[in-house]
Amino acid sequence: MEAQTLYEKLWSSHVVHQEADGTALIYIDRHLVHEVTSPQAFEGLKLAGRKPWRISSIVATADHNIPTDHWEMGIQDPVSRQQVETLDANIREVGSLAYFPFKDQRQGIIHVIGPENGTTLPGMTVVCGDSHTSTHGAFACLAHGIGTSEVEHVMATQCLLQKKSKTMLIKVEGTLGRGVTAKDVVLAIIGRIGTAGGTGYAIEFGGSAIRSLSMEGRMTVCNMAIEAGARAGLVAVDETTIDYLKDKPFAPKGPQWDAAVAYWRTLKSDDGATFDTVVELDATSILPQVTWGTSPEMVTTVDGRVPDPAAIADPVKREGVERALKYMGLAPNTPISEIAVDQVFIGSCTNSRIEDLREAAAVVKGRSKAASVRRVLVVPGSGLVKHQAEAEGLDKVFIEAGFEWREPGCSMCLAMNADRLEPGERCASTSNRNFEGRQGAGGRTHLVSPAMAAAAAVTGHFTDVRTLN
């Protein structure tokens, strides 16, 4: 039998029908649903007189629009409140495998609660009306975002029309240095291949540095595969994967667990499998990263400088850098360490899991928020993460430092709720996108790891976290 990549195994095992032009009908195992991209889909089903094909595939929660403080006051914004109430009504009418409504102790960001509850399992196809569904590829799932019309299509048919992607292997070999995290790894990768480098590809992340990451770290890497232009990000199953899933509420039990694990162990690229493209990075060369512009590929090391457009020969790239620097309010050649921040956000589906909060708390402990920093938000990714963090006393570390400890939700990752930047404010953020206006009109976003965000919070500017430990 011909050697196959992990992507090819996942693809071939889910093809229902294939056309001569390569278009295929793919079966979907898990459908993640939230309040923003689902109302139109449910309405379309009702108008057509249809019901969801397999409600046991649906896992739903409210995350984008919900507030992260003063839950006793409910949702103040009328549009946000309507979306959340509509999701609640739709799910209660049609049913689901699992639904974690607003204020439920297990509620949280959809890409956090899926894995932590065991509803994301290796070998699945996973879709959601959300770009960062690629997160679930950390479990050797074929996972990607879909549009609202496709949300309805999946609900109605349990299938999706797709074309097969090319395959890319990104190998990160070696040992990561002190203070270097999964977020730094994926930002370094995007800095290397660019935001279009993965276009048309499913990226498998491999190498000793990737294998050394926890599942939380692997989710961070796969979460941002979409920011490299990829359709999906993947990591092969190993003992780390299996240990994480054991005893999760929706994971198989007893003999079914044993059978599942036996299958999961096959979910890796075969020896001799051929990738369309291979990229290699030396883990020892990766340093803490900070983005300086309005795209994740506009990134450098914490000891670096903002680029000088005058030194860029390509006129298109030069113009792009000039525009980014103007929006970000930065002068060419400014040292990254001299850039002051107004707010800090520790959260999002990229970096709001327990490991992320531990990393930030380790930096913050015994220190205080810099007087020049207006606000620091720490937003756990789910109620379960929040509960665990509080059991470990992490909330007290943040509160004593002058940070705000919030309820779970998407929060300041995107300006769809009350947590946002004011025009001109600069934020050190653990989220995944630094586009213009992403965190609020006129807001300026710099992407960093939780540890680096914590360092900026206590010093008032971007600081090499390795100098604080």
UniProtKB/Swiss-Prot annotation:
It holds the Pfam family Aconitase. Its cofactor is [4Fe-4S] cluster. GO terms for biological process: L-leucine biosynthetic process. SUPFAM superfamilies: Aconitase iron-sulfur domain (SSF53732). GO terms for molecular function: 3-isopropylmalate dehydratase activity; 4 iron, 4 sulfur cluster binding; metal ion binding. [4Fe-4S] cluster binds at C349, C410, C413. It catalyses: (2R,3S)-3-isopropylmalate = (2S)-2-isopropylmalate. InterPro entries: 3-IsopropMal_deHydase_lsu, Acnase/IPM_dHydase_lsu_aba_1/3, Acoase/IPM_deHydtase_lsu_aba, Aconitase_4Fe-4S_BS, Aconitase_4Fe-4S_dom, IPM_dehydratase_rel_enz, IPMI_cat. It is an enzyme of class 4 (lyase). Signal peptide: none annotated. Its EC number is 4.2.1.33. Keywords: 4Fe-4S, Amino-acid biosynthesis, Branched-chain amino acid biosynthesis, Iron, Iron-sulfur, Leucine biosynthesis, Lyase, Metal-binding. Gene3D superfamilies: Aconitase, domain 3 (3.30.499.10). HAMAP family: LeuC_type1 (MF_01026). Belongs to the aconitase/IPM isomerase family. LeuC type 1 subfamily. Heterodimer of LeuC and LeuD. This is 3-isopropylmalate dehydratase large subunit. The lineage of its organism: Bacteria, Pseudomonadati, Pseudomonadota, Betaproteobacteria, Rhodocyclales.
